[in-house]
Amino acid sequence: MKKIFVFALMAVAALTANAQNIQLHYDFGRNIYPDQEPDRQKVTVTLEQFKADPWGSWYYFVDLDLTNKFFRSAYTEISREFKLGKESPFAAHIEYDGGLGRDDIRSFQHAALLGGAYNGHNEDFSKTWSVQLLYKRFFKSYDYTWAYNSFQLTGVWGLTFANKKCTFSGFIDFWRAENSKPDRYGHGMLVILTEPQFWYNFTPHFSVGSEVEISNNFIYNTYDDKTFFVNPTVALKWNF
């Protein structure tokens, strides 16, 4: 596992060289929910890139959760879209989600996604949006996980306003998961996850803002029956 984790970090380093922006988040979740989220990360570094080309677009992000000594885990989502016609708003969407941690507890279940997307924007690209309907296949990734079929509905948005000084962006995901808690083992559930971000852009390169992770059935909580969580961050962003 250590060798795989080191290899994953090397791959992340390669992605860093091509990143469009880098974000540093300080997470308050563990302060808000000390019993339900005692091991939640405090600091996350996010690398992100979107790149359009004649065929469609590439998008990826990598989240690196940090400890005071080393990386704790790395999670990535990488997607490719192929336009269905030169002027068509529809596209075929292929995606991989997954990551690795320093142990199974902090690892992520891997998944492949395939489906369609409807994309749009206004004339100056200050407003962008996307809706994706996807088949999702989870893979057995570590102990107490198993392979199963699922679906995912995703919405993505971006809005720049106030003479380009403010940016509001984010996504919302809905997908079917199977519960791994002992008393609900294998039971289907609907997971909802959204992470809106607000940025004040001091310069075209430097921004200060916040991300708020709002979820239901997403956080693995063994303390009680709580399933709904709101985890805010304070963040810095640098656009290359």
Predicted regions and their residues:
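Outer-membrane beta-barrel transmembrane domain signature
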Residues: K136-S207, E213-F218, W238-F240
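Solvent-exposed loop/turn segments connecting transmembrane beta-strands
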Residues: E37-Q41, D65-S73, L100-Q109, F139-S150, ...
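Repeated loop/turn-to-beta-strand initiation elements of outer-membrane beta-barrel proteins
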Residues: W55-Y59, G85-A92, N122-W129, L159-F168, ...
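Transmembrane beta-barrel strands of outer-membrane/channel proteins
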Residues: L24-F28, Y60-L64, I94-G98, V131-R137, ...
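Outer-membrane beta-barrel "beta-signal"
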Residues: F228-F240
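Residue-level signature of outer-membrane beta-barrel architecture
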Residues: K51-D53, F82-L84, G116-N122, W157-F161, ...
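Short glycine/proline- and aromatic-enriched beta-strand/turn motifs that initiate or cap beta-hairpins
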Residues: N18-T67
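Membrane-embedded beta-strands of outer-membrane beta-barrel proteins
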Residues: L47, T76-I78, L114-G116, L153-W157, ...
